[in-house]
Amino acid sequence: MMNGLLVIFMAALIFSGAMLANNYIRESADRKRVASDLNLFQNPSMVTNPGEDPYKEVEFPAGILEQLKPFYARNPELVGFITIDGIKDFGYPIVQTDNNDKYYRKNLDLKYSKEGTAFVDYKVDLNAPNQNILIHGHNNKNGLMFGPLEKYNALMYGLDLYKKAPVIKFYGINDVREFKIVGFVVANVKWEDGPTFDFAVTDLSDPAVFNNFKTEVEARTVVNTGYSLEYGDTVMTLHSCCYYFKNVRFLVIARALRPGEDPNVDTNLAKIEFDAVMPDTYVDIYDIGTRAGAYFGNPS
């Protein structure tokens, strides 16, 4: 009997060790790929040998940015590249398809990756005005993809990250746009944790829809950055998981620079909102913030 239990224990130990080793190998490969992609984005001429055209078989969109060519050549579902200066090694290719699940566990080369690929929600029309450009990315608690964004939660980490990294830069196929961050939101997706926020709305052309979105962001943001949303803004929302409790998300909401606006950000305007509207469950666990149920009212 004891010998049988020992065999089972050893088999389980070996299996667990193999799984850990496999996860380590895959994560290491993902880290190398992320570093390689960022390096390639910053140095697109790396792929070019004198006298050679590495893209002679590729049909690029007219006016495509030079930095995007290496990535579009690998995958024509590419729609851009995102960077945030001030967050170490934060730079990722962005794709968009009509299927939000396609890149959940696939990298840009369509190979398995636990990190997946960051993608623009299928509902977004990147060529239309008044859009909320909703970008989904994983947070696997290993510092890759959108994991570092959670450090923007000033209720837990203070304002350090925001002061270093107040701007999102999006390299679209034909242009580069800067987005000033206006808020950070902890959002539950289940009503059992408090009233929810429809952050996934992408068409803000209806003033009533826009005003509701703006009201929610202003009530829920954990930081008043001193910058706000106005009707007609192009909005960007970075969306990822977080682990404060089950089924909760962390959002970074930003808006594009307006015509003639000073691109510089005065981070001294930023203030932590200790009374920010938070999911009820978050307040129950961490004893900070205003319960969303009390602020918005619970459904009957």
Named regions from a protein language model:
Residues 13-300:
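Solvent-exposed, non-transmembrane regions of membrane-associated and secreted proteins
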Residues 1-9:
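N-terminal Sec-pathway targeting helices
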